[in-house]
Amino acid sequence: MEYCEGGDLCSYLERRNNRLLSENMVWRIFIQICMGVYYLHSKNIMHRDLKTLNIFLAKDNEIRIGDMGVAKVLSAKNAFASAKVGTPYYLSPEVCEEKPYNFKSDVWSLGCVLYELCALQHPFKAEN
């Protein structure tokens, strides 16, 4: 695994002490994340735990997606996953309801990451 000197995206945002990222920086980071997820999906790999803790900053703010521990390879025969895995703040409604889910759940998580990049907080907060 490549060493990412910038650490994870969550820590990077925390180190900024609640200072918002510029719009250009948000897009620069987010587009790279989307390209990485697109690549995974093109190989039929669903990450299933996309979050700022699993996105890393390499040299020159280049993005790397890590922690593939719960990733799943989907196929035409098995086009859905059913195990409830991931981090609650980033889970799609299908996963929360323990329904079958597919790549669209990663897209939901991407939306949560984008919200966090823009607002420096999770889109949904609850005690349980």
Where in this protein do the model-derived segments appear?
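Protein kinase catalytic-loop region centered on the HRD/HxD motif
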Residues: 35-45
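AlphaC helix of the protein kinase catalytic domain
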Residues: 10-20
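Activation segment signature within eukaryotic-like protein kinase domains
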Residues: 29-30
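Conserved catalytic-loop aspartate of Hanks-type protein kinases
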Residues: 106
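Structural helix C-cap motif within protein kinase domains
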Residues: 119-122
